[in-house]
Regions:
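Conserved short alpha-helical segments that host acidic/polar catalytic motifs at enzyme active sites
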Residues: 1-250, 254, 266-297, 336, ...
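Hydrophobic alpha-helical scaffolding
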Residues: 7-10, 101, 121, 125, ...
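Glycine-rich oxoanion-binding loops at beta->alpha junctions
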Residues: 68, 72-85, 275-291, 314-350, ...
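Catalytic-loop motifs flanking and including active-site residues across diverse enzymes
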Residues: 127-130, 310, 314, 410-415, ...
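Generic C-terminus detector
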Residues: 231, 546, 561, 571-612
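Active-site phosphate/pyrophosphate-binding segments
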Residues: 264-268, 272-300, 390-519, 592-612
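Glycine-rich phosphate-binding loops that contact phosphosugars or nucleotide phosphates
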Residues: 294-436, 440-443, 523-567, 587, ...
């Protein structure tokens, strides 16, 4: 959730650190800070509460802080309130050790009490300060190397961490360690870079190392050495990131979110082209063999947030096409309920970042039970990608806005192609149906583009909703899955209370919430359910609701009851989610803009939820 950057090289560090932190703002934060070393001098630490621009102003955009080695951090408060005092970096009592940290140290109070007995004092409420002083304690006690001191400290820490640490005795070096919290290291032109996510360093290098779980690294100028927690050197392969640095910039758009909405046709096309070869779906790079697919008796889709909504839509498609029972679960619930998994099942973990804490824990629980796993992730080399038995990479590219758009759309494509291929291999569809589904999928990017080009009507409608108190989304079947995502988009960026309901459940209590003027958005993309959902909408209108209908071209009778109608191109009903979600993304976006809110960085939210 927080962001970490680091740099050691020939250039001045502070401007690079601030630039890197700006690329991590989407992760969410309430304060920020940097620490820079100028040769053998003590580290200069500058911290600020609030937006990164406050820190930039305090440092004259980094120009007033001299030194070629440094670390930086954006903090999301977990231990201690948002304040300059609690912001990172933190230092030992004598300034010997300075560090930044992502994660949660669960036994920090126990460790803190021990350090107080040893004479240490504490100025903040954070668990990070405890880690810094614990490392300092072991560094002085054993008079060993930084790697030794870090190792002694980490074996006593319970919880998750990504640490970037500087030692006074090693002025041009940074030491890194991680457990269950992401970190990436890059090298270029005799300089080294550290980031908790790829965009932080993408401007400077595409040559990166992925530090593994419970590993450490010694970062020098253009040189990185890796260690296990026993202090033994280990080898790492240098990887090349394919993402374009331009993709992490706004490129003339007002917000990242609207840019990423516009990027969806290409992202969907790229993801389709990655698995469709000569008109056929090829899952060889995903890793699942035909024999394994034939043996699957149950599919468990486990995810959080929007990725969970992908799973809800995928359940309908997978069961319809492949005739395999599918269970969709929230990762935060799955990991704690002692699940009973079929040994011949397949657990599918969906996560844009590949680092979502609950999803990663669910993956590990599944592997512990010996069940085959598949990760659908966007970030290459992420924890889920490395630990899953098989991985399906979506090609959304960097997604900066907190509210997902293109990553969601590419996850849907992954689900569709898996369902179609599973159905073919298991003999549930004919060759003609197989080809027909693939051909229809290949029309999706162009149809998304057509919807985006007609956004002005939605922009006008959104401007009328800025004072809405409640908005309800209703649908049946796949339309319910669409409603879930539309509702989340609305509430997370416009701050309007919004809920999604299965339309058939309205009469079981929900309809009592309808008042005069309450906006009810009905999603009607499934032909066999159209009349039933329309009937539910009419029932809402009779109680004073203001209706918006979202359906496919041709269903113009919706206008007899809806106060505002939105149409999407026709497609196979199984794939309707890919089209119907676009107007709902645009609606949430334009309502937020009309209210003057921070679209890309909504309050209290983080892009990558890497702690519980």
């Amino acid at each position: 959730m927080c962001g970490i950057v680091g740099f050691t090289g020939e250039h001045q560090a502070a401007p690079i650190l601030l630039d890197g932190l700006s690329k991590l703002e989407y992760r969410g934060y309430d304060s920020a800070g940097i620490a820079v070393r100028d040769g053998s001098a003590d580290a200069e630490i500058i911290k600020a509460k609030g937006r990164l621009k406050v820190l930039a102003e305090k440092t004259n955009d980094g120009e007033s802080v001299k030194g070629t080695c440094g670390i930086g951090h954006t903090r999301w408060a977990t231990h201690g309130e948002p304040s300059e005092n609690n912001a990172h970096p933190h230092a030992s009592d004598d300034g010997n050790v300075v560090a930044v940290h992502n994660g949660i140290i669960e036994n920090y109070q126990e460790l803190k009490d021990k350090l107080v007995r040893k004479g240490y004092t504490f100025y903040s409420e954070t668990d990070t300060e405890v880690a810094v002083k614990l490392i300092d304690y072991y560094y002085k006690k054993y008079e060993g190397t930084p790697v030794d001191a870090i190792n002694h400290a980490l074996v006593r820490i319970r919880g998750s961490y990504a640490l970037a640490i500087m030692f006074r005795d090693y002025p041009e070096e940074i030491y890194v360690a991680r457990k269950d919290s992401p970190m990436i290291l890059g090298v270029a032109n005799g300089e080294s870079y550290i980031g908790s996510d790829v965009p932080a360093i993408l401007k400077y290098t595409r040559d990166v190392y992925y530090i593994g779980n419970q590993e450490m690294a010694r970062v020098r100028k253009g040189e990185i050495t890796f260690y296990n927690l026993d202090g033994e050197e280990i080898e790492k392969e240098l990887k090349t990131v394919e993402w374009d640095a331009e993709a992490a910039e706004k490129s003339g758009y007002e917000h990242f979110m609207i840019k990423e909405i516009h990027e969806q046709p290409k992202a969907v096309s790229d993801t389709l082209n990655s698995v469709i070869k000569d008109g056929m779906i090829d899952l060889s790079e995903v890793g699942l063999s035909e024999e394994e697919i034939k043996e699957i008796s149950q599919i468990y889709i486990v995810a959080c947030g929007s990725a969970y909504h992908v799973g809800v839509a995928a359940q309908y498609v997978m069961e319809d096409f492949a005739r395999i029972p599918v269970r969709v679960e929230l990762a935060s619930e799955f990991r704690y309920r002692n699940p009973i998994l079929d040994p011949k099942g397949l657990v599918v973990i969906i996560s844009q970042s590949g680092e979502t804490a609950d999803s990663l824990a669910a993956l590990r629980e599944s592997k512990k039970q010996g069940v085959k796993t598949l990760g659908i992730v966007n970030v290459i080399g992420s924890s889920i990608a490395r630990e899953a038995d098989n991985v399906y990479y979506t090609l959304a590219g960097p997604e900066i806005a907190v509210a997902t758009t293109k990553a969601y759309s590419t996850q849907l494509i992954a689900a569709y192609t898996l369902a179609i291929q599973f159905a073919k291999i298991r003999g549930q569809i004919t060759e003609e149906q197989y080809i027909g589904y693939i051909e229809e999928l290949q029309t999706i990017p162009e149809k998304i583009q057509r919807i985006i080009e007609d956004k002005e009507r939605l922009q006008w409608f959104a401007s009328k909703q800025v004072n809405a108190k409640d908005i309800f989304f209703i649908g049946r079947g796949i339309d319910y899955a669409i409603s879930l995502e539309g509702s989340l988009k609305m509430k997370e960026i416009s701050y309007i209370h919004s809920e999604a309901y299965a339309a058939g459940e309205l009469k079981h209590g929900t309809i009592s919430l309808i008042e005069d003027g309450t906006l009810v958005i009905g999603v009607l993309t499934q032909p066999e359910l159209y009349e039933k959902t329309l009937s539910n909408m009419v029932e809402c209108k009779s109680r004073g609701a203001y209706l918006m209908g979202l359906t496919t071209f041709g269903h113009y009778n919706i206008e007899e009851n809806a106060d505002f109608s939105v149409y999407i191109p026709k497609t196979d009903p199984h794939f309707a989610t890919s089209l119907a979600v676009i107007p709902l993304q645009l609606l949430g976006y334009y309502v937020s803009v009309a209210k003057g809110l921070d679209v890309d960085k909504p309050r209290n939210l983080a892009k990558s939820v890497t702690v519980e």
